[in-house]
Structures are given as structure tokens and as C-alpha cells.
Amino acid sequence: MIDSLTTLMIYFFLPVSYLLVGFVIMYYTREAFKKHMLENMVSPMWQNYVFVMILLIWPFFLFLVVTTTILKLFKAVVN
């Protein structure tokens, strides 16, 4: 059975760490991202909005993939 420390790690520390890593990566690549990607796809009025939405959403997808993999590994180890 998965103990409480592992549960805390999976549901608290992993999402927080992925969000922090995501924010740091997006912070340091924001100018290149805005210039090369958003300039060609989105009108200038919406660029900041789209950038913030991507900044907030993509770490959650990364978190879901990694957490699901970890949970499957724990389940395989436990069984």
C-alpha cells in the first residue's frame, strides 16, 4: 500500500515542482516564444493572453503524464 509520505509527494510536491520548472522555462524563453511563435499565429492584442494561458496550462499536462506514469509504476511494484 502507498504510504502517506508518497501520497503527499505525488499530490503536492510533484505539481508544485512542475509548475515552478514550467514557469522558469517559460520566463527565460518568453521573448523568443512571443517573437517566433505568437507573432505569426495571433494578433498583437491577444498575444499576452495566449502566452499566459499557455504558461498556466502546459505544466499541468506534463504533471499528468508523469504522475500517471509514477502511479502505474507504484501499482506494478505493490502488486
Swiss-Prot record:
Subcellular location: Host membrane
Record flagged with keyword Transferase: no
UniProt entry keywords in alphabetical sequence: Host membrane, Membrane, Transmembrane, Transmembrane helix
Disulphide linkage map: none
Keyword Oxidoreductase among UniProt keywords: no
One of the record's GO cellular component terms: membrane
Bilayer-spanning residue ranges: 8-28, 50-70
Highest taxon listed in the record's lineage: Viruses
UniProt membrane topology term: Multi-pass membrane protein
Entry protein name: Putative transmembrane protein ORF17
